[in-house]
Curated annotation (Swiss-Prot):
Protein's name in the database: GTPase Der
Record-level GO BP terms: ribosome biogenesis
GO molecular function: GTP binding; ribosome binding
Keyword GTP-binding: yes
Complex and partners: Associates with the 50S ribosomal subunit.
UniProt-annotated binding residues for GTP 1: 36-43, 85-89, 151-154
Family from the record: Belongs to the TRAFAC class TrmE-Era-EngA-EngB-Septin-like GTPase superfamily. EngA (Der) GTPase family.
Listed HAMAP family: GTPase_Der
Species: Leptospira interrogans serogroup Icterohaemorrhagiae serovar Lai (strain 56601)
Residue ranges constituting the KH-like domain according to the UniProt record: 404-488
Keyword GTP-binding among record annotations: yes
Known function: GTPase that plays an essential role in the late steps of ribosome biogenesis.
Domain EngA-type G: 30-199, 227-403
């Protein structure tokens, strides 16, 4: 059982979100990675430098399972780099999952431009020495700039306090407090110094020279992308495998262990001249299973990912079908008004398939949750990359359709015609009448209808109108909200 969660992020000035320049073709934005053994405060430092709680922080070893990354851009200080939080590198006797985690972390080290090696003021272990030896010996790492930071130094440290670290052969160490934000400005200055000759420097200066500089707190950059796509679903439905299939390499840790992904992972992708930000979320669990603080944070982050997304892929496990909790996910997507489509993963594992198998699957699905009748659905295999490209084509199509705007005159004409077709068939009272309607948003497709009697518009009539709107304006997968208001004075 995890210990009680610590409130590790000190209150600071509000994050100012600004538009970061899109990188020029062929230009590389430098990468800075935080490394160290488990439980030295890597995720806390990551969050503190970003000034937002993106990584899960918990006084419990091994919380970070994936490499998290976020771009830090601050024009007036000539800062532009990707900051990465890596898993602890001191896993003993790793199983297959842990081995994959380690391989991902070590690959990240080799791809980094600057490394921040984090140590704990209160304890130096054999694992620290082992990691230090690796950094010194590994060919693809040894020549990289390394900043040695001693964390949890909440009070001033003199040379005597740091003597044990100097005995490790470190010529210079920087005492910091990730929680208290002590010396983080100095750490950023050191990072900036080592990045001076790295790729991207010329590009940063070129952009800076053309823009007016304004004093701002360190911002979290907003990337130049078309839309944000989130992948959600039950644990072990194959979300990380799908992310990897889309990216074309192992961006997230993949395992058959449910809930491998604890953090939400953002990946910026380019398809031709189109860009999207892809988010792989922690598996949503029933609330009763999120008692531990770690699972609670993962659940909350998944909800937040849905709220901040423009489009969602709801991933199902072909063998497990559409369960009660999948219904909760779909209801949540409807409630939040998010355009979404269904991807039935692991379709290759279904045996004895015929031409009717998919049709029968959809009929069974629609009988359990009729609202899914108007949602695009596709079968895929993430591990075999089966129909993954078609899934992305559907996603781009849905993104384009989610901005559908209809003129007020056309809406009024069509809705009044449909109301005339309905007549009294949907109401035992006088015929329901619509006097006027207007569209107030595109995603969800939200209409306000001024009517004679709100109570005359029963659920069956509302469903009829939604169906006509979906068919007429190609709104499959886009939630429709009809808000009825009485026009009576």
């Amino acid at each position: 059982m995890a210990k009680a969660v610590k409130k590790e992020i000190a209150k600071s000035e509000e994050v100012v979100s600004i538009k970061a320049p899109r990188k020029e073709p062929g230009k590389k934005i430098p990468v800075v990675s935080i490394v160290g053994r488990q439980n030295v405060g890597k995720s806390t430092l990551f969050n503190s430098l970003l000034k937002k709680k993106l990584a899960i922080t918990e006084d419990y070893p091994g919380v970070t399972r994936d490499v998290l990354s976020a771009r830090i851009y601050q024009e007036e200080k000539d800062l532009d780099f990707y900051l990465c939080d890596t898993p602890g590198l001191d896993i003993e006797n790793p199983d297959s999952l842990s081995q994959t985690i380690l391989e991902t972390a070590y690959r990240q080290l080799r791809e980094s431009d600057v490394i921040v090696f984090l140590l704990d003021k209160n304890l130096i272990t054999t694992a620290d020495h082992g990691l230090l030896n690796y950094l010194r010996r590994e060919d693809k790492v040894a020549n990289k700039p390394i900043i040695y930071c001693v964390n949890k130094a909440d009070k001033e440290l003199d040379e005597f306090d740091l003597e044990e670290f100097y005995r490790m052969g470190l010529s210079e160490v920087l005492p910091i407090s990730a929680i208290g934000r002590k010396n983080l400005g100095l750490l950023l200055e050191k990072i900036q110094f080592f990045l001076k000759d790295k790729p991207g420097k010329v590009w940063i200066e070129k952009i800076s020279a053309s823009k007016k500089k304004e004093a701002q707190p360190l911002p979290l950059a907003e990337e130049d992308y078309e839309f944000r796509l989130a992948i959600v679903g039950k644990p072990n439905s194959g979300k990380s495998s799908l992310l990897n299939a889309i990216c074309g390499y192992e961006r997230a840790v993949v395992s058959d262990v449910a809930g491998t992904t604890r953090d939400s992972i953002d990946t910026l992708l380019e398809f031709g001249d189109r860009r999207l930000l892809l988010t792989d979320t922690a598996g949503i669990r029933k609330q009763s299973k999120t008692a531990e603080a770690l699972e609670f944070y993962s659940y909350q982050r998944t909800i937040k990912a849905i709220e901040s997304s423009d489009l969602v892929i709801h991933l199902l496990d072909a063998k497990k079908g559409f369960g009660d909790f999948d219904k909760k996910i779909t209801s949540l997507l409807q409630e939040k008004g998010k355009p979404f489509l269904l991807a039935v993963n692991k379709w290759d594992s279904i045996e004895d398939k015929t031409d009717k198998t998919f049709k029968e699957y959809k009929e069974k699905l629609y009988s359990r949750f009729p609202l899914l009748n108007e949602v695009p659905i596709i079968t895929i295999s993430a591990t075999e990359r089966l129909r993954v490209q078609k899934l992305m084509d559907l996603s781009f199509d849905l993104a384009s359709r989610s901005h559908r705007k209809v003129s007020t005159s056309e809406l009024n004409k069509n809705l009044k015609n449909w109301m005339g077709l309905a007549g009294r068939s949907f109401s035992a009272h006088q015929p329901p009448k619509m006097l006027y309607c207007t569209q107030v948003s595109t995603s969800p497709f939200h209409l306000i209808l001024f009517v004679n009697h709100v109570e005359y518009f029963k659920s069956n009539l509302v469903s009829f109108l939604k169906k006509k709107l979906t068919e007429t304006y190609d709104l499959q997968g886009i939630p429709i909200r009809l808000e009825f208001r009485s026009d009576r004075k």
